[in-house]
Regions:
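Acidic, low-complexity intrinsically disordered segments
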Residues: 53-92
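A short, structured beta-strand/loop element
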Residues: 17-59
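Short, charged/polar N-terminal "headpieces" of proteins
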Residues: 1-23
Length: 92
């Protein structure tokens, strides 16, 4: 599972076996875990919280969402590279 970047101790990463799903990232404090927060990336560069399974406090989660949205192009490029796809499927 490639780590994209770290925000205040939270890792933002992909799970390597989820390329059949629309583009999204996982967020966890410290090392990646199956019980991580999942964020859908929208086609317009926004974010939708699919779940907050890692219980990130809302004020921290909102800051993370802003940074993830600002990294839209990086995340899309890394998704294409990691999953070896040319077209990205978005949640919405």
């Amino acid at each position: 599972m490639p780590s994209l970047f770290t925000i205040g101790g939270y890792k933002v990463y992909f799970w390597s076996n989820e390329n059949n799903e629309p583009i999204h990232v996982h967020i966890a404090k410290g090392k990646p875990t199956p019980n991580s927060t999942k964020i859908w990336i929208t086609s317009k560069g926004g974010c939708i919280v699919a779940n907050n399974a890692s219980h990130i406090p809302i004020n921290e989660l909102n800051e993370i969402l802003e940074i993830v949205a600002a990294q839209f192009f990086l995340i899309c490029a890394e998704w294409r590279k990691h999953f070896m796809v040319s077209d990205i499927q978005f949640y919405c």
